A protein has these predicted regions:
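Acidic, two-metal ion nucleic-acid-processing modules in DNA metabolism proteins
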Residues: 1-196
Length: 196
């Protein structure tokens, strides 16, 4: 079985070589098949030979539903969006974006310090927390984008000049009887508005 990407119709590509299969079925984004061991290598060669994907086709595309300021991220909005569940391929979870966000602080957490608990801040000083699950990757990127000194300031919770753009999901956090809305970042990049 296999899963595909939007730019590659896996089922059609497999059907172009249907003589190699015992049986094959699926749709553009996924397929399943039964094949003999002897036909496996000819299939691999045919699919690789006929593949017309470009580097651009392999870049993940994220579709933002709305640009949403921190002050708009409220529990009532979260509860309204929760009515759209369950999320899946045909009903994707709403994705929001904010540009020119500051990073107030990062604290590495988890058994191996692999997650980054972040506090983000907008231009008005409004703050929101978020958990980045690829925390070490985020720290490495911050060092590349802004330098070691700015990264150290962020880790110490000091004033810094880092600006990022974030794509995120809203998440409800319940801790010690307190309910709050957090960001669940999906993608973070150096802000297009950052000036060195």
């Amino acid at each position: 079985s296999g899963r595909s990407i939007e730019t590659y119709n896996m089922f059609d590509k497999l059907c172009e070589h249907k003589e190699l299969f015992v049986k094959v079925g699926g749709h553009p984004m996924a397929a399943g098949f039964t094949i003999t061991r002897e036909a496996l290598e000819p299939l691999r060669e045919a699919l690789n030979r006929d593949c017309n994907l470009t580097d651009a086709d392999l870049v993940e595309k994220l579709y933002v539903d709305e640009s949403c300021a921190i002050k708009q991220l409220t529990l009532p909005l979260y509860e309204e969006l929760a009515k759209l569940e369950p999320y899946g391929t045909a009903n994707v979870r709403p994705l929001f974006g904010i540009v020119k966000m500051g990073i107030r602080s990062i604290k590495m957490v988890g058994n191996e310090g692999q997650y980054a608990r972040c506090t983000f801040v907008d231009g008005n000083g409004t703050r929101i927390n978020g958990m980045v699950f690829r925390g070490k990757e985020l720290l490495d990127n911050i060092k590349v984008w802004f330098g070691d000194k700015e990264c150290d300031k962020i880790l110490k919770g000091l004033q810094n000049h880092a600006l990022i753009d974030i794509l995120y999901h809203m998440k409800k956090n319940e801790f010690n009887g307190t309910v709050s809305i957090q960001m669940e970042p999906v993608s973070i990049r150096k802000s297009v508005y950052y000036e060195t």
